[in-house]
Amino acid sequence: MEGKEEDVRLGANKFTERQPIGTAAQSQDKDYKEPPPAPLFEPGELSSWSFYRAGIAEFVATFLFLYITILTVMGVVKSSTKCSTVGIQGIAWAFGGMIFALVYCTAGISGGHINPAVTFGLFLARKLSLTRALFYMVMQCLGAICGAGVVKGFQKGLYENNGGGANVVAPGYTKGDGLGAEIVGTFILVYTVFSATDAKRSARDSHVPILAPLPIGFAVFLVHLATIPITGTGINPARSLGAAIIYNKGHAWDDHWIFWVGPFIGAALAALYHQVVIRAIPFKSRS
């Protein structure tokens, strides 16, 4: 496939361009420059309205995410027959669909993280400062707590009786199983985030930034399909924390550490893989 070319139709304009595919596309000069790494500390952000606006966007997005998804979980749990509700597939669609919609809405304001693990992975890749990363994580957790709290306010009895959407390792699985599921699931999500938002790809293909929320939401959907039977699917420490705090019963905290340690390990591995193996950033800096 090296060096082969194909005609590409560009939207409704019907213009054609000669675009190489295969390895030839990788070697073509696209006037791309590697963005500089974010500083570790950036005190100037604290005096910028855009900094606080981004945090508010993360709060609202995570609030809405917990509100819709926990309501969906409660609707499935309360049913006596699987055929009368959306089931596991519906829960997975609710989580994936909300991430798709919310990332689309907030990407231009905050980057659309909605997840401390995503924020942590991007911080390790030097995509944002420690100041911003910590602020995002706090706002995400507060939004998740408020979102779960509103659900409990709407249907307290049902919420209390059905576990409040809290993440726990299911019977028949060990804590190691749960931890492994969270690590791999978060790796898939964060690696998808890196790939979908890659600046080099965006420079090459102008449609990529618009479509970025789609693969991210789809990754969330697929991971939920696979791991709901194991842990209820965390892959988002804010989601797990919000549900656990509002439900606040003993078993909700028994395995809670898994839903922080697993996602953070998965995010770190995804950042390492993307930056070192896929993008080869350390090797570029030496050349």
From Swiss-Prot:
Residues 77-89, 155-175, 231-257 are extracellular. Barely detectable in roots, leaves and fruits. It is a multi-pass membrane protein. GO terms for cellular component: plasma membrane. A motif (NPA 1) lies at residues 115-117. InterPro entries: Aquaporin-like, Aquaporin_transptr, MIP, MIP_CS. The chain crosses the membrane at residues 56-76, 90-110, 134-154, 176-196, 210-230, 258-278. It comes from Musa acuminata subsp. malaccensis. Belongs to the MIP/aquaporin (TC 1.A.8) family. PIP (TC 1.A.8.11) subfamily. This is Aquaporin PIP1-2.
